[in-house]
Amino acid sequence: ASPQQLQRINKLELVVETIPLTEVWLRGPKFVDQPDLADSAVSHRRYGDMGVHYAFGTDNKPYSPFATLWAAVARTERGTGTVLGPEQRLSRMDALRAFTMGGAYFCFEEDRRGSIEVGKLADMAVLSDDLLQMPEGYIPDLNSVLTLVGGEVTHQTTDF
C-alpha cells in the first residue's frame, strides 16, 4: 500500500488483515528482482509507523501461525533466500502483537482478549521454545504444547 493509501486507511479507522506467509514466501519470487515492489508488499513496519492497525491471518497452506509469524520477521523468499523489503521486517514482539492484540482489535474484542490482563479471557498458549530468543530459522517449527481458551485447556501435548 502506498503512504497515501495508508493515510486513508488510518483516517477511515480501518484494520488491515494480511497473511505474510502468502505474500512473502509463496508469492515472493515475483518480488526478487523488484525491490520497490517487495518493499510495498505487506509493509507492516510502515503500517505501524503510520499508526495503521493490522492483524495476521493464516488461511493458506502451509497453515501455521508460526510460519506466518516467521515470514513477517524474516521476509525471506523461499527460492533464493532473498530478504524482501528488509526495512519492513518486524521484530518478533511486533509480529506476535499482530496475532494477539491485532487480532483482538480486528474482531472488536480488544477489551476481552488479545493480552493477558485482569478481567480478560485467559486465551494463551505455552510454546515449545522461546520465540523471542530462539534462532530465527526455527520459528516455523514452533508449536503449542498447551493452549487455553477462556481459561480452559483446549490442547495439551502428551509430554507437557
Per-region residue spans from a language model:
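Residue-level structural signal for beta-strand termini and adjacent loop
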Residues: 159-160
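Short acidic loop-to-helix transition motifs that present clustered carboxylates
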Residues: 1-2
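His/Asp/Glu-enriched, well-ordered alpha-helical/loop segment
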Residues: 7-14, 18-133, 137, 142, ...
